[in-house]
Structures are given as C-alpha cells and as structure tokens.
UniProtKB/Swiss-Prot annotation:
The keyword Transmembrane applies. Pfam families: COX2, COX2_TM. Keywords: Copper, Electron transport, Magnesium, Membrane, Metal-binding, Mitochondrion, Mitochondrion inner membrane, Respiratory chain, Translocase, Transmembrane, Transmembrane helix, Transport. Cu cation A2 binds at residues 196, 198, 200, 204. Its EC number is 7.1.1.9. It comes from Branchiostoma floridae (Florida lancelet). It is a multi-pass membrane protein. The keyword NAD does not apply. Component of the cytochrome c oxidase, the last enzyme in the mitochondrial electron transport chain which drives oxidative phosphorylation. The respiratory chain contains 3 multisubunit complexes succinate dehydrogenase (complex II, CII), ubiquinol-cytochrome c oxidoreductase (cytochrome b-c1 complex, complex III, CIII) and cytochrome c oxidase (complex IV, CIV), that cooperate to transfer electrons derived from NADH and succinate to molecular oxygen, creating an electrochemical gradient over the inner membrane that drives transmembrane transport and the ATP synthase. One of its GO terms (biological process) is ATP synthesis coupled electron transport. Its cofactor is Cu cation. Gene3D superfamilies: 1.10.287.90, Cupredoxins - blue copper proteins. This is Cytochrome c oxidase subunit 2. The gene is COII. It is found in: Mitochondrion inner membrane.
C-alpha cells in the first residue's frame, strides 16, 4: 500500500503491474534523454558568439527534427500498445467474481464454483484494530487465490463508480447497466488496498477495496467457511 511522502510506484503484485512499471521506466528514460538534449542545445545556443541572421530555411535540419520525433513516438508507442492489449488479455479464467458498486459500498459475488455473496463496507474509526489502515479497511475482504487467472466483472447499481487497486494495476469503471471485465492474477500472497476512483457522491471517499491474496488451500478453506455461514 502507499506510504506517506512516497514518490515512486507501489510494489507490483501482479504481472500486469510489473509490465506497467517497466513501461514507466522506459518512458521516463526517453523523457530524460529528450530533456537533457534540449537543455544542452539551449546552453550551446545561448553561449555561442556566432549568429547567422540570414538563415531562412534548412531542409536538412527540418528533416531531422521531423524524423527523430517520429522515431521516438514509435519507440514509446510499441511497448504501450503491447501493454494495452496485455491488460485486456483473458484466456480461460479459473475463477470469476462480480463486483457491484453502490452508494457507498461494494458487493461481491462468487458464482463460478461457490454461491457466495457479501457486501463490503468501510470500517468506522472506532472499529479499527491496531495497525489497521484508516479509511481503507473493510468488514468483508475479497479473498483470492494466488497464481490463479481471475476474471472480474464490474458494474454498478446506481451511479458510475470505478474499481481500482493500484498495486495490482487494476482500474475499471463500474457503469450502471453495463458489464465490464478485467483480468487479474495475484503473483504473491498479501493484502492489497484500493478505492473508488470515480467521484460518485458525498461519501465517495469511503468506498475502499481490500483484496487478500492467499494460497489455494487457504482460499478453499475460506470458501467452505463462507458456505457454512450461508
């Protein structure tokens, strides 16, 4: 999860987020090189004692500053397109869950193998335990098995919401009357926090999302426990 005064990205907890971090570093390298080149050119021009006042055109330089930016755009665009299609790639998911946004809480359904449904509300400050995150803890967490291909169906019951978990590289709008989907695979055990990322009313800030990634055996035990409570 994010920490105070954090400047970098969260640690990746999914293959997609790892690729996003690599792409971020790739683009930042390109931007730094461009910035250094521009500042160097400015410094040379400012410090130069020679001025050619009668230069009206230059076919070579115009070709250079057209071709080089085009090449740079291709260098940035190709990894971006690859990542874009990777985020939408969903091949034979092993588990499907449905997330429904409400004002102002989330409800979840596990309908593939287990008939499990529950609502997930933010815990008030008075119910927090020592070490819990303020405004991020919920009464019912989404429990998922690690290293498992999961399909998340996202929709809303009232207004537009957005189901977002940064450390997993997930963000999908929840639109009433429309069913969106995204691919999810947790690459390590842990607890990952997110929030609604679409302004949806007075209590928009109080719609946290908590995903708990556990080993498959623990997930099966959790499912049995939830079924016993039904």
């Amino acid at each position: 999860m994010a920490t105070p005064a954090q400047l970098g990205l969260m640690d990746a907890a999914s293959p997609v987020m790892e690729e996003m971090i690599y792409f971020h570093d790739h683009v930042m390298l390109v931007l730094i090189l461009i910035t250094c080149l521009i500042f160097y050119s400015m410094l040379v021009l400012i410090s130069s004692k020679y001025i050619y006042r009668f230069l009206t055109d230059g076919h070579v330089i115009e070709t250079v500053w057209t071709v080089i930016p085009a090449i740079i755009l291709v260098v940035v665009a190709l990894p971006s397109l690859k990542l874009l299609y990777l985020t939408d790639e969903l091949d034979n998911p092993q588990l499907t869950i449905k997330s429904v946004g409400h004002q102002w809480y989330w409800s979840y359904e596990y309908t593939d193998y287990y008939d499990i449904e529950f609502d997930s509300y933010m815990l008030p400050l008075g119910d927090l335990s020592k070490g819990d995150a303020r405004l991020l803890e919920v009464d019912n967490r989404v429990v998922l098995p690690v290293d498992t291909s999961v399909r998340v169906l996202v929709t809303a019951a009232d207004v537009i919401h957005s189901w977002t978990v940064p450390s997993l590289g997930l963000k999908m709008d929840a639109v009433p009357g429309r069913l969106n989907q995204l691919a999810l695979q947790c690459s390590r055990v842990g607890t990952f926090y997110g929030q609604c990322s679409e302004i949806c009313g007075a209590n928009h800030s109080f719609m946290p999302i908590v995903i708990e990634a556990v080993p498959v055996e623990v997930f099966e035990g959790w499912c049995d426990m939830m079924l016993d409570e039904e």
